[in-house]
Swiss-Prot record:
The lineage of its organism: Eukaryota, Discoba, Euglenozoa, Kinetoplastea, Metakinetoplastina. This is Terminal uridylyltransferase 1. Mg(2+) binds at residues 310, 312. Disruption phenotype: RNAi-mediated knockdown at the procyclic stage causes severe growth defect and a severe reduction in mRNA editing. Reduced production of guided RNAs (gRNA) and rRNAs due to a block in the processing of gRNA and rRNA precursors. Accumulation of unprocessed precursors for some pre-edited and never-edited mRNAs. Oligomer. Component of the mitochondrial 3' processome (MPsome) complex composed at least of terminal uridylyltransferase KRET1/TUT1, 3'-5' exonuclease DSS1, MPSS1, MPSS2 and MPSS3. Within the complex, interacts with DSS1, MPSS1 and MPSS3. Binds 1 Mg(2+) or Mn(2+) per subunit. The type of divalent cation used by the enzyme affects the nucleotide specificity; Mg(2+) induces predominantly uridine (U) incorporation while Mn(2+) also induces substantial incorporation of both adenine (A) and cytosine (C).
Length: 976
């Protein structure tokens, strides 16, 4: 490959020499003629300069400088800038100084532009170059200074701040960046610098690369020059600024701990992560019986889990890794485990296998966005229940075999309840734990009928095992386990280390610095930067990465131990000291990477206690991908695999993976943006009189409360459940409203054989009586608004008044119609009602018929006792109480929608005592459901079985109907 480029460069050099020879011959001919005037000679010179402009500009900084000042464009090609086509350069640093000298005045404009360097030059300060004059006849200087810069922070650009006692020192960009323009390449040639925004732009000097980035990609760096210049004014007076902003820095430290306290959801949340790991291991062991699941990532390094962040899992066979045969073929492993997860009820939409990445993983996005604070008893019962759905009715042998398969998977004592539906095509089971539920779901069901197929899923859409309700990433490499253990050892060595790491992670995500998809840093790299700063400043002791064993044979921390974010035993005095230290550490982080760290020569590394340079690791030479292999679609001569150049602009060494730069995708343009965000964060933390900073933008936008601590206990187990209860209560109350209080309700008055009836829209009908058949045949809508519905505006006002926090939470996820649908209702003519209210309508119509008949016959309805009277009201009220208390009676082992519980109403309530007093002896012998102290219903002789309640309820209704018919003929008076 080198010989190929060498031939191309020699050809380019010959073309250059031919152009120079031709130009000299023409110039010599003009001198011999002697009659060319000065204007024509100057014009010819400009013509030949323009002719050779492209070739000269690519390799000679002097030509480049002259061309930019003359207004020429820099259109470069890879061929013209590769090594070999360049003549020997005597002093490239001098050429760079001519192009980028900040003290050099612009002759065309007379503007004196200087930069205050102070101590930054000695500490490896990063300063990017401003744009030169783009046009020779332009009206303003273009070194990155604009008119609005003068008003930012009241900072001048004429060096007037030198009166503070700090010497104004001018340096060239080559000195500031610390780059050696004569660095040798991989095989003794000149080092190349490529642009990350232009795939075909390659340069031989770092100064030329910076000039190219600032001139052609200035739209990607809108604030870089301004923020850099303001931050440099702060550098010479750094100690004075810290003393002046002491109270502000302490307030930031207090906010750091408040933000960190919100991420600590307590030990119970960490135990949920432990159970999720055990459940995932049950699934993985169906694929590989010796595989173990490990937790790594932030939950291990921080020692806490907030319940919302994703969890990183690693599948490792420890014995195979010791033999050197792990990981397996990761693409096949991703497909196999994805299929197993989908088999146990994971959604195709929420489960995303990524098999073609550098590290193949499986990503899971939880379907329920409503967060859980505490799981109640009823939710726990439903969460450890699963459902087997068959494609046909099962015989007695099929039932026995399927139940036996479940018991064999979890043990004889692992199953608490098993019940079948009426059609024998669905079996549900409640296990002793959620982990046992997943283990039962992974069993191989045995069936006697060859045509039967089973599908297993959780018994509930919301209350499921912990693995279904968390976001997680599953990989097959053990690097993360060792890395997380190392980070945990560092972060637990100082009480301010973990809170600071959390704030910096939020800042990096909101600022765009933490965006690995677009080629920036990862959260792991940000943590390495934070720890490296703490080690260099002496906040935490150095830990040798080799102290963490590579082998996992003796590894026992499968479930990371919970460590509170804030020690509950610290005193108020100690807390104030921690606030002060945390603020100093956070501000010092931004100052360290803005001015002190030498990005040009050094590497952020935890492998050595001292300073690591790029030359020590061989990272001072950039790997430039040849043109033919930059893309798969570049032609038939390219490589079949797309390659990306490994860049060493910003270097972060991985502690364990050899020769891995965590910033390998960050080129010059992205590096300038990273440094811009560092400047921005530093200035926002030190700005006087401000209570908001871009560093805490994530906490401010999410509405983090000012006081630390866990989430409020006022938030119910799930926000949807409280809204369900309020909706059901509102519908029940609307049905119980007196008929006279509604404008559209019918009023019936009885007296002296005359009645006045006002129906619906106010039409009056007079007569000797009311025809019961006409009222009985009337539709429910003829009596005004639906008896079981509530108006949309009324329901919304109830939500805002009684559950504002829950209503605001769910509206961030769904719109109004989606929310009503999630609650199990529908909107009909502006009213909210259950989606399937056929049974309720029949009951309500029957009550209306009886009321009309009794009014027509002159019977006092207040004195008549009917067991079925008010059944709709009682049903809805009891159902709402079930939603509010979340008892197993209302759950009914199915989705928690109102429409699916109305037919099984006997599971929700028992016969009222008032009705029981008037019940005839024949009906009183019907056994009622006895509720044990544990809260679980006892059905039948065996506790492990439960018969369906719907047939029993139909028998009760049939007997009640017969008794009602008999009582109309011969009134029955029960003994008092």
């Amino acid at each position: 490959m080198v010989s190929k480029y060498h031939r191309l460069l020699q050809q380019g050099l010959r073309e250059e020499e031919e152009g120079v020879t031709e130009r000299n011959m023409v110039a010599g001919g003009e001198q011999r003629h002697g009659h060319v005037d000065d204007d024509n000679a100057e014009g010819d010179a400009d013509f030949y300069d323009q002719k050779d402009e492209r070739r000269a500009k690519m390799w000679n900084p002097k030509h480049e400088s002259a061309n930019v000042s003359a207004g020429g464009k820099q259109n470069r090609s890879v061929r013209d800038c590769l090594p070999g086509s360049l003549p020997p350069v005597a002093n490239t640093s001098t050429d760079a100084a001519v192009r980028f000298d900040r003290e050099r005045k612009n002759a065309g404009h007379g503007v004196d532009i200087s930069c205050v360097e102070g101590d930054g030059a000695q500490m490896g300060t990063y300063v990017s170059t401003g744009r030169s004059d783009a046009k020779a006849g332009g009206g303003s200087s273009a070194i990155g200074v604009t008119a609005d810069d003068e008003s930012d922070g009241n900072l001048d650009t004429d060096g007037s701040d030198a009166s503070e006692g700090d010497e104004v020192e001018s340096t060239t960009d080559a000195d500031v960046y610390g780059e050696d323009d004569t660095t040798e390449g991989p095989r003794g040639g000149v080092r190349l610098y490529s642009c990350d925004a232009c795939p075909h732009a390659v340069f031989t000097t770092h100064a030329a690369l910076l000039a190219h980035a600032e001139e052609h990609h200035a739209d990607l760096l809108p604030d870089h020059a301004r923020l850099r210049r303001i931050a440099q004014k702060l550098n010479p007076v750094w100690n004075r600024a810290l003393n002046a902003r002491r109270n502000t820095i302490t307030s930031w430290g207090k906010k750091i701990f408040h933000v960190a306290a919100q991420r600590d959801a307590g030990e119970s949340k960490m135990q949920e992560a432990h159970r999720a790991r055990a459940q995932l291991e049950c699934v993985v062991r169906r694929w590989h019986d010796k595989a173990r699941v490990f937790i790594f990532g932030s939950s291990v390094a921080m020692g806490v889990w907030d319940g919302t962040a994703d969890i990183d899992f690693a599948v490792v066979d420890v014995d195979a890794m010791e033999r050197g045969s792990w990981p397996p073929l990761e693409k096949n492993a991703v497909r196999s485990i994805t299929e197993l997860l989908r088999r146990v009820g994971f959604s195709f939409v929420n489960l995303e296998p990524i098999s073609h990445a550098r590290v193949p993983i499986i990503k899971h996005h939880a379907s329920s966005p409503i967060l859980t604070v505490a799981r109640r008893d009823a939710e726990d019962v439903v969460a450890r229940s699963i459902r087997f759905i068959l494609n046909g009715p099962a015989t007695r042998e099929d039932r026995l075999l399927l139940e036996g398969s479940v018991r064999d998977a979890v043990g004889p004592t692992g199953v608490q309840q098993v019940w079948w539906n009426r059609t024998s095509d669905m079996m549900s089971a409640t296990l002793e734990s959620t982990t046992a539920a997943v283990r039962a779901a992974m069993c191989s069901p045995a069936l006697a009928s060859a045509s039967l197929r089973t599908k297993v899923q959780p018994a509930h859409d919301e209350c499921r095992p912990e693995l279904y309700n968390i976001d997680f990433d599953l990989s097959f490499r053990a690097f993360g386990i060792r890395n997380s253990t190392l980070l945990r050892k560092y972060l637990l060595s100082h009480p301010c280390a973990r809170p600071g790491a959390i704030v910096l992670k939020d800042w990096s995500k909101t600022s765009g610095v933490n965006n690995s998809v677009n080629g920036y840093f990862t959260s792991y790299a940000i943590n390495i930067m934070w720890i490296y700063y703490l080690v260099q400043k002496g906040y935490v002791p150095y830990v040798d990465p080799l102290e963490i064993p590579e082998s996992l044979v003796n590894y026992t921390d499968f479930d990371p131990r919970y460590t509170p974010m804030i020690d509950p035993e610290i005193t108020n005095t100690e807390r104030e000291e921690l606030y002060k230290a945390a603020g100093d550490m956070l501000v010092g982080f931004f100052y360290f990477y803005s001015f002190e760290f030498d990005w040009g020569h050094n590497v952020i590394s935890l492998n050595r206690p001292g300073i690591t340079t790029k030359r020590m690791l061989g990272w001072h030479v950039e790997d430039v991908v040849p043109v033919a292999s930059t893309s798969v679609s570049s032609g038939g001569g390219g490589s079949n695999v797309k390659r990306h150049p490994t860049r060493y602009e910003l270097c972060i060494e991985d502690p364990y993976e050899e020769n891995l730069n965590l910033g390998r995708h960050i080129g010059v343009t992205k590096s300038l943006r990273v440094r811009t965000e560092l400047y921005r964060g530093l200035l926002s933390l030190l700005k006087e009189g401000e209570t908001r900073s871009c560093v805490f933008a994530a906490a401010d936008s999410s509405g983090t409360p000012a006081a630390g601590g866990k989430q409020s206990a006022a938030l119910p187990a799930r926000a949807l459940f409280k809204l369900m209860a309020l909706t059901t209560q509102a519908i029940s109350e609307s049905r119980r409203l007196p008929q006279s209080n509604s404008d559209n309700s019918g009023r019936i008055a009885n007296g002296d054989n005359e009645s006045l009836t006002e129906v619906g829209g106010g039409h009056r009908v007079e007569g000797a009586g009311v025809d019961p058949a006409s009222c009985a045949g009337a539709s429910l809508s003829s009596f005004g608004e639906p008896p079981i519905g509530v108006h949309e505006k009324t329901l919304e006002s109830i939500f805002v008044e009684k559950a504002p926090m829950e209503f605001q939470l769910v509206r961030k996820v769904w719109n109004w119609h989606q929310l009503i649908h999630r609650l199990g209702y529908k909107i009909h003519r502006g009213h909210v009602m259950p989606r399937r209210e056929v049974g309720v309508r029949c009951t309500a119509r029957r009550d209306a018929e009886e009321t009309t008949t009794e009014l027509a016959s002159g019977v006092d309805t207040t004195k008549s006792l009917r067991p079925g009277r008010g059944l709709t009201d009682t049903m809805l009220r009891d159902l709402s109480r079930g939603y509010m208390t979340l008892t197993p009676e209302w759950v009914a082992w199915s989705a928690p929608w109102v429409s699916q519980h109305l037919r099984g109403y006997s599971r929700l309530t028992t016969v009222r005592s008032a009705v029981a007093d008037e019940t005839p002896p024949a009906l009183a012998t019907v056994p009622s459901v006895v509720k044990p102290p544990t809260g679980e219903a006892v059905m039948g002789a065996m506790r492990t079985t439960r018969r369906n309640a719907a047939p029993a309820r139909r028998v009760e209704l049939l007997k009640l109907w017969l008794w009602r018919g008999i009582s109309k003929v011969t009134p029955f008076k029960s003994p008092r």
